[in-house]
Amino acid sequence: SQAAKPGSNDDSCVLEIGNGRARVLLPGDISARVEMRLQREMTRPVSLIVAPHHGSRTSSSRAFVRLAGAPIAWFSAGFGNRYGHPHPDVIGRFQDIGARLHVTAWSGALSWSSRDPDRVGEERLEAPYWRAPVSPVGSVSSW
């Protein structure tokens, strides 16, 4: 197979992190071509996946999404981005396997812990940044 050109999206660092309770897949900006190589090495579903390449149309092939089998899928994409990420077809592929979707453009910053792998924190929805804690008169706020 042809190697990725240096500096191309397919040259992304791919990480799988696990601790015995949960596993997370961080595939960077890889395309479906690199996903095919990863599929040969994937032995079981992950707990959470960050959608490759922000959910672009050229990533997250149907076979890759099924094999990853993540019940939670994150899409790291800016609000109103010019590329239209995440692509509706990719969203549909993750919905087809029943994954819960979290998109930073809609939800803001996301947080997750293997201690409670079914819960995803959404900062914009749960703690609006414009609501600073109120300090008693004369004291200094610690935030």
Where are these regions (language model features)?
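Active-site-proximal loop/helix segments of hydrolase catalytic cores
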Residues: 1-86
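Binuclear metal-ion centers of metallo-dependent hydrolases, dominated by the metallo-beta-lactamase
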Residues: 3-9, 79-143
